[in-house]
Amino acid sequence: MSEFKYISLLQKVLATGTVRNNARNMKTKSVFGEKLVSNAEKESFPLLTTKKMYWNGIVSELNWFMKGGVDSRILQKQNVHIWDGNTSREYLDSRGLKKYEVGECGPIYGFQWRRSGARYIGMYHNYENEGVDQLQTCVDLIKKEPESRRIIVSAWNPIQLPEMCLPPCHILYQWYVNTQKGTLDCQMYQRSADLFLGLPFNIASTALLNCIIAEITGLKSNTISIVIGDAHIYENQFKAVEEQIGRPPMKYPRLKFKNKITGIDTWSKDDIEILEYLSHPAIKVPMVS
């Protein structure tokens, strides 16, 4: 995915998007049914350059997801505050989650990835051997049944949606192994994409997830595809988006593993680094929560 494709999507939504009201009491412009594709054989790591990206937050959040995290205070200790707004006392109460402690997310992404089907008892409960470890199952299938069409992780659990501080946006991942080339592709479906704040994060996170799974399974990360349902821009982002559109993209950086990653639980952000990342300055707009 060249950055120009992302910029073109921003332009399309601003120019032709349908004006809609949403549950967060802020109008959006949106389109439906978009797809972005990134080919690792032709491009480097897709970390956007038209604004400075929050790399520490991207890596830390993915590590937290992959380890089944449900306590946002773990991220806070790493100076990552992207979940603070959705786990504040006021916000949790507005979701009817008055019994949750501040920082408690409920059975969100990480829980579904690693403990799917388990009953959510709280963030202090030991969920070992409870539920289905979807992520590890995918790693095992890639190694043992690489041509399986069931290499899938889903975060969409209708029964537990009311227990989540935020229903999942990126809800499904599917992997495809090309056994002849030794490559790994990933397609992600995202029901809702905040194109300015959320999607750049999701693009990098999906690419990083595929790189890590490829590293664990001895494959080469290849194509990532992101299919988007509701692709929207909030009205408080319009000026910022116009500023970003006016910036020329730079060359993507490179991703390097400093240490060999052998399992989904055994890596840390210190094992990964981004090289040669040049970007325009950050553009800050408050997150709508």
Predicted regions and their residues:
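Terminal, non-catalytic protein-protein interaction segments that mediate quaternary/complex assembly
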Residues: M1-S289
